[in-house]
């Protein structure tokens, strides 16, 4: 990876931040190997959105209204209001369906969203199937006998997993940082490393939900790389990491084999997390697409790599590796409030547009990856990208970068600069405060439904009708009943 350009003033400011370190450490931090990971999740989300927008612009108008198409017939959702009071508008509308041999799968009436003054009008929702070749003419004919005709274009949303086992389908990788393809990857010219990384990635390729995560027998060289990363970062944690991270890190050392001479196994760490917060790990071959990665968080599943960075660059990896995952992400996922915050980002992503996915990926970047928090008046780090990068961890708490109060609306559109380090970070007053702000932000994401995670069945419940909402309220009443009884017992 080429040495990044650092301005004279920035270099001086950064050297002030490391003035208390010995010369060897200071020299090491200024080297390119201490530069953090690239903004791959955000770049991926942006490219996904741009590609989808380009495809939409190039498509015919009929393609934007089709719910699905098969064997020459198109399925679509149709919304409309009917004209006239003296004639029979419904019979005229049905005549259009009959003329075009439309097969009606579902028909219902709703109170109109745009009632005329003094009247409560009905809106019709029809899910129907018509010949693809007749689609434009069919829509035009409906518009002649109905008002406010709308199609599925407004309500279309991306597929997302509804059951935890469907995460087996969320395997879309971003390969641009793969050592086989990235010329700047430290392992690009090392055939032995590339083959080793590929063999470890095969574990994730064959993994299915419910399987125990296979062990990896790490080599002496891999363990030596881990040791350098572990010991170097651990020296900073007492003064730079938030208290939630420190508490979890101590427990991981006690129960999960975290130490400088041992790379923890994902299965053991996953069991630990599940007992603490319900999160579990799942092996992944590499960098997932933003949509698939965020969807996993909705189920309290964290997609985790098992391979380790190249030995020539122990303090830098252009892609996520087990050092980043185990030292950066895992300790924070052991905190209940932070775990809920992470899941909320995932839930907000389900069915979201490509534009919203890009914003959520940026929010993830400035919180889960590079977030700061204020504890007892002192700013501490909680982001995984900071806690797994010696150089950026020091930089983030120096006087060099700009630190702003966390505002999801601002963070979601903040440009990212990750070479060499971030110029802007967002600081939260607490994880609870960040969680509440995120939920307010997510409430404004436009979807034709809301979602709720069902922990007993590890599934996503769609709240898209009064019936499903009432059903969900029943479980809330049951929980309230239990809590009221508990209060009565102790009072």
Swiss-Prot record:
Pathway of action: Catecholamine biosynthesis; dopamine biosynthesis; dopamine from L-tyrosine: step 1/2
Described purpose of this protein according to its UniProt entry: Plays an important role in the physiology of adrenergic neurons.
Modified residues (Phosphoserine): 19, 31, 40
Similarity field: Belongs to the biopterin-dependent aromatic amino acid hydroxylase family.
GO BP term, pick one: vocalization behavior
Protein name: Tyrosine 3-monooxygenase
Keywords: Catecholamine biosynthesis, Cell projection, Cytoplasm, Iron, Metal-binding, Monooxygenase, Neurotransmitter biosynthesis, Oxidoreductase, Phosphoprotein
Cofactor: Fe(2+)
Reaction(s) catalysed by this chain's protein: (6R)-L-erythro-5,6,7,8-tetrahydrobiopterin + L-tyrosine + O2 = (4aS,6R)-4a-hydroxy-L-erythro-5,6,7,8-tetrahydrobiopterin + L-dopa
Species of the source: Phasianidae sp.
Enzyme Commission no: 1.14.16.2
Regulation: Phosphorylation leads to an increase in the catalytic activity.
Record localization: Cytoplasm, Perinuclear region; Cell projection, Axon
